[in-house]
Amino acid sequence: QLNATFYSGTCPNASAIVRSTIQQAFQSDTRIGASLIRLHFHDCFVDGCDASILLDDSGSIQSEKNAGPNANSARGFNVVDNIKTALENTCPGVVSCSDILALASEASVSLTGGPSWTVLLGRRDSLTANLAGANSAIPSPFEGLSNITSKFSAVGLNTNDLVALSGAHTFGRARCGVFNNRLFNFSGTNGPDPTLNSTLLSSLQQLCPQNGSASTITNLDLSTPDAFDNNYFANLQSNNGLLQSDQELFSTLGSATIAVVTSFASNQTLFFQAFAQSMINMGNISPLTGSNGEIRLDCKKVDGS
């Protein structure tokens, strides 16, 4: 059972150390908060929140970093390593890499204007990775709402969690390659996605021409790209969602998600409360506790390897 005081006797400053390291990282990288919370998300959806996403290729381990949802896009690993080093210097062998991801997510959100919440702790780190699981379990920006809802449901998260957690796209960037399917030939129609605002469409077509680079990046939230707020939901209401998986939350006819988007768009406090609770819910997915797993000394590799 995870709890808020897990390190109070062994590493009381753990949370403060994580926070100050991330504060430092923000100085040179305004998108680091979004990158760190995404690592936690992509970790938790694959065999639970066990830091399996952080393991590099080695021996029998096929790294999840090479999975489609992570290759060329998962980032922030260096900051996780910096946090781990700082923690090892203060309380060696105590704080798990999976707990670092949970703490880093809360710090990333609260440092950018979003809510704070009490992070439950006590996760341990996996001894292996699951490349196939990362390829199949992580929701894709190209998927329809029903598929994405099923993937959330498979890890015990409901429609409210889905909409709240999607709100993390209030900050961070996305590459042309994850939304250019909407720009020219959407689902074989030879035209753009009809749910994409025409002004945004023209600017994205210029940014991401048909034979252009798939790795050019743009803001997920065109109004306040680096602030954690509820503007993401207002963007959906004006068809300014960047990803297909974003816009479908509001544009899928008859979907239960529409009312949730509407309520979050009109009430930031409500969104912040829901987001904090859904982050706790996501952080509770199948953690390794007790004597399961280990406390990795280096987040990139299993101890003794």
Swiss-Prot record:
Chain sites annotated for binding Ca(2+) 2: 170, 221, 224, 229
Record: residues binding heme b: 169
Pyrrolidone carboxylic acid PTM positions: 1
Glycosylation sites: 3, 13, 147, 185, 197, 211, 267
Classification via CDD domains: secretory_peroxidase (cd00693)
Name of the molecule in the record: Peroxidase A2
Taxonomic source organism: Armoracia rusticana
Swiss-Prot/TrEMBL cofactor(s): Ca(2+); heme b
Bridged cysteine pairs (disulfide): 11-91, 44-49, 97-299, 176-208
Catalyzed reactions per annotation: 2 a phenolic donor + H2O2 = 2 a phenolic radical donor + 2 H2O
Molecular-function GO terms, alphabetical: heme binding; lactoperoxidase activity; metal ion binding
Presence of the UniProt keyword Glycoprotein in the record: yes
Cofactor binding note: Binds 2 calcium ions per subunit.
